[in-house]
Amino acid sequence: MASADQPTGVDRLGHVAIRVENVDRAVAFYTDLGMRLVWHADDWCYLEVGEGRDGLALLGPNYKAAGPHFAFHFRDRTGVDVIHDRLKAQGVHVGAVHDHRDGTASFYLKDPEGNWLEMLYEPPGGIPSNC
């Protein structure tokens, strides 16, 4: 993996995604805790807290694109491609990089312990709202 003199490009730990049975009920719970709903789709929602830098994705029962995971966020799209290529060259099984409908781009992989994680480019200003 990357050494101290070889930065990975990871900006921060950005969001956690959890599976929920009832998206609307979960949104109500988390907005009551002070989170802001910024993306709402039929099968998933995204909420932010604070200055919009920390997020929670609520994955409904019909959401099939990904399962529960945590995500490292990158400041630029190139960083995602660089880490994707580096991990692949090291023999790590990584998914393809996808451009998403919310302006982000990402890929998924498992760490050596079997935990799912996402490497995500987040556009300047954060994930745009569709609400």
Positions of PLM-derived features:
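Vicinal oxygen chelate
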Residues: 2-9, 13-21, 62-131
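Long, continuous compositionally biased terminal/linker segments
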Residues: 6, 55-60
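Core segments of cupin and vicinal oxygen chelate
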Residues: 10, 17-55
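Alpha-helical elements of the RecA-like P-loop NTPase motor core of helicases
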Residues: 27-28, 81, 118
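Acetyl-CoA-dependent GNAT
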Residues: 41, 59-61, 121-125
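Short hydrophobic/aromatic beta-strand element in the GNAT-like acyltransferase core
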Residues: 46, 55, 71, 94, ...
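Short low-complexity, flexible loop/linker segments enriched in glycine and/or proline
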Residues: 53-56, 110-112
